Amino acid sequence: MIKWPWKVQESAHQTALPWQEALSIPLLTGLTEQEQSKLVTLAERFLQQKRLVPLQGFELDSLRSCRIALLFCLPVLELGLEWLDGFHEVLIYPAPFVVDDEWEDDIGLVHNQRIVQSGQSWQQGPIVLNWLDIQDSFDASGFNLIIHEVAHKLDTRNGDRASGVPFIPLREVAGWEHDLHAAMNNIQEEIELVGENAASIDAYAASDPAECFAVLSEYFFSAPELFAPRFPSLWQRFCQFYQQDPLQRLHHANDTDSFSATNVH
């Protein structure tokens, strides 16, 4: 019998968090009971260690907090919560937000412009998100803002800047870079053929290696059926790094649904 961590007797001053309800989103339906229990344990620790900061009047209740924590912890389910030690705060806007962006062009001129962002992440500093896109991260569509920003944090553990290569053994770096760049080229070829809007993988993945790793991490967890057959070698590298196989998880969930359907009387 699985001993659910949120069903343990709590002290009188502590309010039980709605973990069971928080788990009931499409992205997490394929998890086994053991995985759910482990994920909740990590998410509880996440909420103890990190500060969720609502901005611009956004209201953060216990269910929203739990679901945010679960999504943060899904990528590190097997890696461990220490992989998320590069930040202490999560800032949450109600909707995409405007920031001042500074960039340098090819001839060295510095430009400033205001742009709309869904999320932001720095090597040392808070993660910035918005609730509208967090809500869109609950399904299995290939889009997941939280996993995208977590991937950037995991990426920067390997050095001063995001490179698209997370902290893996040195002997595996060349193979990882080869497969990642091959995926970027393949995605770019599709974009040139059908256009960004019709591409089957988010075109942002072709912009640079760091974004490719972050975008494909979204697909790894929320649309493995699109990632695995298209980039099988890179898929295996992601499975080895994250120590998870979401495609196998998806097949198990589908088999369970089929079995249940055939046994309805």
Swiss-Prot record:
Protein location: Cytoplasm
Keyword Transport appears in the UniProt entry: no
Xref: CDD domains: Peptidase_M90_mtfA (cd20169)
Cofactor binding, note field: Binds 1 zinc ion per subunit.
Enzyme Commission numbers on file: 3.4.11.-
GO MF: aminopeptidase activity; metallopeptidase activity; zinc ion binding
Coiled coil regions, renumbered to chain: none
Residues that coordinate or bind Zn(2+): H111, H148, H152, E211
UniProt keyword annotations, A-Z: Aminopeptidase, Cytoplasm, Hydrolase, Metal-binding, Metalloprotease, Protease, Zinc
Pfam families reported in the protein's UniProt record: Peptidase_M90
Principal place of residence: cytoplasm
Cofactors demanded by this protein: Zn(2+)
GO cellular component: cytosol
GO biological process, one term: proteolysis
KW Ribonucleoprotein (keyword) present: no
Protein task: Involved in the modulation of the activity of the glucose-phosphotransferase system (glucose-PTS). Interacts with the transcriptional repressor Mlc, preventing its interaction with DNA and leading to the modulation of expression of genes regulated by Mlc, including ptsG, which encodes the PTS system glucose-specific EIICB component.
Subunit structure: Interacts with Mlc.
HAMAP family: MtfA (MF_01593)
Family, per entry: Belongs to the MtfA family.
Entry protein name: Mlc titration factor A
Gene (name only): mtfA
